[in-house]
Amino acid sequence: MNRLQVVLPGLNLKNPIIPASGCFGFGEEFAKLYDLSVLGGIMIKAATGEERYGNPTPRVAESGMGMLNAIGLQNPGVEGIIAQKLPFLRQFDTEIIANVAGSTPEEYEDVTRRISRDPVVKAIELNISCPNVKSGGLQFGTDPQMAAELTRRVKAVSEKPVYVKLSPNVTSIVEMAQAVEQAGADGLTMINTLVGMRIDVRTGQPILANRIGGLSGPAIKPVAVRMIHDVAQVVTIPIIGMGGVMEVDDVLEMIYAGASAVAIGTANFVNPFICQELITDLPKRMDELGIEHIMDIRGKAYGATLHRA
């Protein structure tokens, strides 16, 4: 028996550890360091309809217990990813999750339709934390009706299961989760970054050229755990948790809260071997805590009895 195996819609994960989108590129650099086949899955960098060059620099700023970033979805475009990036990933025995972003519902549909056809891709991660240019820049992920409609449209064209990535920058993440579940989402990934800002006191101006950025790292882990805990109690679809995971106990914490798998983001910048180390450390820590199978503890923080997927 594989004590770490997690089976989710479209995904047969040998373990629950997945590098998060935007923090692992397309795996090329990390593949020079270790065999990516050890990973449960890989969430690759976001794909948009056309190539994007990203925001002006500086794009990254350090913050206490975390970092701010405003990369701006830099990527070679969906056709560039399909032609240049996905072939490289075919050699690895791991589940590839394609992150899809856009500025209009039509762009999301187009990107999803194209990338979900590729046999390398096993699932879609729908990044709804993007501004809708047709709605005055309001983010898809901050309005339940808009998020639900986008989910429905993407589901209608996707050949693979769709996991919706939820933003914490909302009044009620529970309401958002329920809305996209009712619209047909196969799963959730959460949480995305918190919006933040840093100011250079020598100039009185924001450090980031974009002024604001997404806060990630250990500073946001308690927020992520609380939101996973709240959402897991009201949805029936699985959750891939993320937000500030730096060590093996952080992984267990998110699973206790209700996540089925855990994505690792900022920690990859601090320690490029972190995912490999977590996979090694997880069964050892489970032995110490008397945990037989990783799914035995899912949702136990709120007393739920959740069956093994």
From Swiss-Prot:
Cofactor note: Binds 1 FMN per subunit.
InterPro entries, per database record: Aldolase_TIM, DHO_dehydrogenase, DHOD_1B, Dihydroorotate_DH_1, Dihydroorotate_DH_1_2, Dihydroorotate_DH_cat, Dihydroorotate_DH_CS, Dihydroorotate_DH_I
GO biological processes: 'de novo' pyrimidine nucleobase biosynthetic process; 'de novo' UMP biosynthetic process
Catalytic machinery residues: 130 (nucleophile)
Chief subcellular location: cytoplasm
This protein's pathway: Pyrimidine metabolism; UMP biosynthesis via de novo pathway; orotate from (S)-dihydroorotate (NAD(+) route): step 1/1
GO CC, alphabetical: cytoplasm
The protein's required cofactors: FMN
Short name of one Pfam family: DHO_dh
Residues at which FMN binds: 21, 45-46, 99, 127, 165, 191, 217, 243-244, 265-266
UniProt keywords, alphabetically: Cytoplasm, Flavoprotein, FMN, NAD, Oxidoreductase, Pyrimidine biosynthesis
One Gene Ontology molecular-function label: dihydroorotate dehydrogenase (NAD+) activity
Reaction catalysis annotation: (S)-dihydroorotate + NAD(+) = orotate + NADH + H(+)
Annotated binding of substrate, by residue: 45, 69-73, 127, 192-193
Protein's cellular compartments: Cytoplasm
EC identifiers of the protein: 1.3.1.14
Annotated function: Catalyzes the conversion of dihydroorotate to orotate with NAD(+) as electron acceptor.
Subunit structure: Heterotetramer of 2 PyrK and 2 PyrD type B subunits.
UniProt cross-references to PANTHER family, sorted A to Z: DIHYDROOROTATE DEHYDROGENASE (FUMARATE), DIHYDROOROTATE DEHYDROGENASE (QUINONE), MITOCHONDRIAL-RELATED
Family affiliation: Belongs to the dihydroorotate dehydrogenase family. Type 1 subfamily.
Protein name: Dihydroorotate dehydrogenase B (NAD(+)), catalytic subunit
Organism: Exiguobacterium sibiricum (strain DSM 17290 / CCUG 55495 / CIP 109462 / JCM 13490 / 255-15)
